[in-house]
Swiss-Prot record:
One of its GO terms (cellular component) is cytoplasm. GO terms for molecular function: nickel cation binding; urease activity. The lineage of its organism: Bacteria, Pseudomonadati, Pseudomonadota, Alphaproteobacteria, Hyphomicrobiales. Coiled coil: none annotated. NCBIfam families: PRK13241.1 (NF009712), urease_gam (TIGR00193). It is an enzyme of class 3 (hydrolase). Pathway: Nitrogen metabolism; urea degradation; CO(2) and NH(3) from urea (urease route): step 1/1. This is Urease subunit gamma.
């Protein structure tokens, strides 16, 4: 299987998001990379489903809450930027203050 670096990155984010979801189901608080992966995966999958950029920017801020991440993590993440493929092309989506 020959994957481009971009495809490998997408796969890694998707796998990290799966791990994060399982940890949340068990009641384990997420660390920095897990929180970023979960939000990023939400945006990428939303784009794939055809959701609008503005919708994903707003909805991405409600994927996880402060009580689902380790202490201090919410304060470390100010913006999450994800390059996602939409039906009309690739766009950069920025989620501001994603953990509220």
């Amino acid at each position: 299987m020959n994957l481009s670096p971009r495809e490998k990155d997408k796969l890694l984010i998707s796998m990290a998001a799966m791990v994060a979801r399982r940890r949340l189901e068990r009641g384990v608080k997420l660390n920095y990379p897990e929180a970023i992966a979960l939000i990023s995966d939400f945006v990428v999958e939303g784009a794939r489903d055809g959701r609008a950029v503005a919708d994903l920017m707003e909805a991405g801020a409600h994927v996880i809450s402060r009580d689902q991440v380790m202490d201090g993590i919410a304060d470390m993440i100010h913006d999450v930027q994800v390059e996602a493929t939409f039906p009309d092309g690739t766009k950069l989506v920025t989620v501001h203050e994603p953990i509220r």
